[in-house]
Amino acid sequence: LQVILTEKLTMVYLRAFTQLVWLTHGALVGDVVAVKCAISQDDFEGGKNFSETVSQALCACIKLLGKDYLEVKSNAVKSSDGCFIYDMITMKYLRTLATIEIGTTVDVENELAIIGTRGRITVPGDWWNTGYFEAKIEGQEFLKRYSFNFEGNGLRYLLQELVIMIRDRRTECTRFFYEESETLAELLKIINQRG
């Protein structure tokens, strides 16, 4: 009997996100200098806890920048009664900085931005559930828009991957690898200890 465990990070199964990662790694905007993720917990599939919400942003950073971060800092703000209301998480890489902004009862504008030496990629709105992003490339007058159709919230694509894994007798997902999963767990542990 074999059991397959996988994170419910439906974002990594969306074609638009896969294309975004591919184009970023292909230097569409040059060398990546910064990744900025902002997410309002109230907008993110209501009822999710902080760890589930921050996992989406951490996953995006890991997929875009890799698992070899140098340090991570969490700067949580709590209300007078001790409830979490805002956090700014920074992840330092060798030549890149990632910032994750999460708010619960404060207004945070949902956005994912990848800033490079030759331009910027922006995923507006609910970027963890995206079918669309745009790139502003140095020397080009107009934005380049990328749009991909998908149905639902990505769960069907996660289930499709699980069925393929079972059929092929694989235990590792091809969209979020073991090493990435271990890095995510390590980052969550660090953030939860400091928050």
Ranges and model annotations:
Residues 9-18, 40-71, 158, 180:
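Mid-domain beta-loop-alpha active-site segment that forms a flexible
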Residues 19-23, 60, 161, 186:
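Alpha-helical elements of Rossmann-like donor-binding domains used by nucleotide-donor carbohydrate transfer enzymes
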Residues 1-44:
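A contiguous active-site-proximal alpha/beta segment in oxidoreductase catalytic domains
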Residues 4, 161-195:
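C-terminal helix-rich "cap/oligomerization" subdomain common to oxidoreductases
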Residues 147-160:
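Active-site loop of classical SDR/Rossmann-like NAD(P)-dependent oxidoreductases
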Residues 90-95, 135-142:
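Short acidic, glycine-rich loop/turn motifs
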Residues 34-38, 73, 148-149:
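Short amphipathic
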Residues 52-129, 159-170:
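Contiguous beta-strand/loop segments that form the cofactor/metal-binding neighborhood of enzyme cores
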